[in-house]
């Protein structure tokens, strides 16, 4: 995409995360600093556009909401746009349900994981073998309102399950370090259910699933890391696969609701690809959305 933007006459400044893990606050700071660095070395741009994928899309969202006077438009792709808590709840509920139906298969639990866990040999392969050996619980995990794993076929659904479990295994200790070891996932009052499965199937789940209660300071960290306000004052286009295996597509609808409540619906345009994957959106679709964003900013007419 960098080459395509350059050929279209745009200068590009970009930043990676300076640390591993859920470094959303640092990502926001570093990316925002780019504009000042660019101005000091090259000159003040006539227009500035934000582009980001996945966690980077959340960075873009935060900057668009927080500094609308410094950016003209934003393209947020496959992003954590419903907020950090929404993503944590998705992953945490997936792990909690997996542990209920497949006890003892994986190390640790929702809020505990051994250091230096092997994501392939300790998470992915044991989970895959457990599911393939007993597929009966899979729909109860996949179709729960709290998870709704992406996929139209069993292989896609299993892939989404494994992605969530590996994501959890690699990220939970980082998250706990950021909350000083305090629990940030809360299912203490969650009633597990599904729009596709009778409630009776979830009676044992609701009676016996492991419960966790988040602490107020951990909730405060979530709120600061980043929860969207919906106060979107510049044009934004979102692009997301409908069956995203890692960051659920419904993040976009959660953000739409926040934008609607803030009275900023005119500034948000949602687009999707009816396919399975994560961020592999393709250059043509990406550039089309970017070009449409530029046209929107220039003309004031929403595509």
Segments predicted by a language model, with ranges:
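Accessory cap/linker subdomain of secreted extracellular hydrolases
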Residues: 80-227
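Catalytic active-site module of serine/aspartate enzymes centered on a nucleophile-bearing elbow/loop
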Residues: 285-303
């Amino acid at each position: 995409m960098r080459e395509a933007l350059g050929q279209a006459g745009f200068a590009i400044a970009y930043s990676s995360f300076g640390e591993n893990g859920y470094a959303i606050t640092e990502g926001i700071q570093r990316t925002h600093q780019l504009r000042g660095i660019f101005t000091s070395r090259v000159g003040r741009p006539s227009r500035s556009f934000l582009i980001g994928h996945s966690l980077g899309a959340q960075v873009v969202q935060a900057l668009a909401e927080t500094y609308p006077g410094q950016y003209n438009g934003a393209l947020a792709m496959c992003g954590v746009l419903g907020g950090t808590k929404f993503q944590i709840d998705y992953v945490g509920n997936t792990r909690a349900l997996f542990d209920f139906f497949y006890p003892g298969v994986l190390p640790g639990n929702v809020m505990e994981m051994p250091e230096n866990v092997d994501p392939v040999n300790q998470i992915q392969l044991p989970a895959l073998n457990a599911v393939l050996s007993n597929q009966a619980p899979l729909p109860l995990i996949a179709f729960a309102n709290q998870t709704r794993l992406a996929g139209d076929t069993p292989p896609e659904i299993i892939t989404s399950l494994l992605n969530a479990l590996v994501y959890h295994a690699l990220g939970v200790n980082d998250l706990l370090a950021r909350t000083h070891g305090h629990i940030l996932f809360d299912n203490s009052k969650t009633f597990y259910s599904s729009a596709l499965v009778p409630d009776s199937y979830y009676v044992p789940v609701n009676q016996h699933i492991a419960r966790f209660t988040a602490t107020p300071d951990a909730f405060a960290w979530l709120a600061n890391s980043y929860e969207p306000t919906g106060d979107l004052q510049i044009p934004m286009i979102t692009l997301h696969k409908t069956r995203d295996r890692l960051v659920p597509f419904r993040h976009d609808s959660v953000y739409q609701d926040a934008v609607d409540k803030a009275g900023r619906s005119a500034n948000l345009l949602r687009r999707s690809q009816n396919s399975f994957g994560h961020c592999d959106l393709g250059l043509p679709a990406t550039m089309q959305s970017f070009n449409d964003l530029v046209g929107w900013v220039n003309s004031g007419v929403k595509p």
